[in-house]
Amino acid sequence: MFRVHCNKCFRHRKTDPAVPFHLTQCRHVICGPCLGQSSLEKNCPLCGQVLKAIQINRDMPTSVANYFADPLRFQQIYRKISKFQADQRASDNLGFYRQLQQLEQNKRQLEGFCKMEAQLNQKVVEEKKRIAELRTYIAYHENAQRMTRRRHSAGERFHTPEFKEAWNTSISTSDKSPSDMPSDSSRRSADLDTQSTRRRSFGSDTKGFRL
């Protein structure tokens, strides 16, 4: 801690406690008598800047009173502040690092999911192709079975009593059909042949026969 004194006449506050001391805006300490001499010029007697001062007492603002406080106290506060802010920066960096790790993990999982999706899509395509082939195979064999059942059903109808009866009826009817019966022209030809035969037989026996 320093001793408060006038920076112009070097008067100490402890020596003349009744004399007021002032702190200028340019950070100089000036006693009341020296300040009175400079107030007419309105300039700091040490640096010549515009004079603007505040009296040093217990009613000073905190921002001004801190210039007269023990610097060790501020050093301790500074250490605490520095440690607090350093811890906060470390915590922020740790959070950022963990977020980065989580991001990398999510990226790997996403790549794995994308690969799995591609494999599943390929599997779906293969299964659809396999299903189409199976449907074609099933349709082919169902059609073959239907054709086989039709042939088998047709073969069984030939051996039923109704089919045999109908078959025999058709045969007997065809035997007696007009095509098998002698026609009129055939009968005429037969009669003519018979008459000529008779003539020939009678002509040979009755030659010279007279009534």
Curated annotation (Swiss-Prot):
SUPFAM superfamilies given in the database record: RING/U-box
Cellular component per GO, a single term: site of double-strand break
Tissue distribution: Expressed in nurse cell and pro-oocytes (at protein level).
Location of region: Disordered: 149-211
An annotated Gene Ontology molecular function: zinc ion binding
Superkingdom of origin: Eukaryota
PROSITE patterns reported for this sequence: ZF_RING_1, ZF_RING_2
InterPro entries: Zip3/RNF212-like, Znf_RING, Znf_RING/FYVE/PHD, Znf_RING_CS
Keyword annotations of the record: Chromosome, Chromosome partition, Meiosis, Metal-binding, Zinc, Zinc-finger
UniProt zinc finger (RING-type) residues: 6-47
Entry's Gene Ontology BP terms: homologous chromosome pairing at meiosis; positive regulation of meiotic DNA double-strand break formation; reciprocal meiotic recombination
Subcellular location: Chromosome
Composition bias type Low complexity, residue spans: 172-184
Biased composition annotated in UniProt, kind: Basic and acidic residues: 153-165
Subunit and partners: May interact with itself, with nenya and vilya through its RING-type zinc finger.
Miscellaneous field: Nenya, narya and vilya contain a RING-type zinc finger domain and are named after the Three Rings of Power given by the elves of Eregion in J.R.R. Tolkien's books.
Job description of the protein: Required for the formation of DNA double-strand breaks (DSBs) together with nenya and vilya during the meiotic recombination process. Plays a role in DSBs processing into crossovers. Plays a redundant role with nenya in chromosome segregation during female meiosis.
UniProt name for this protein: RING finger protein narya
Originating organism: Drosophila melanogaster (Fruit fly)
The encoding gene: narya
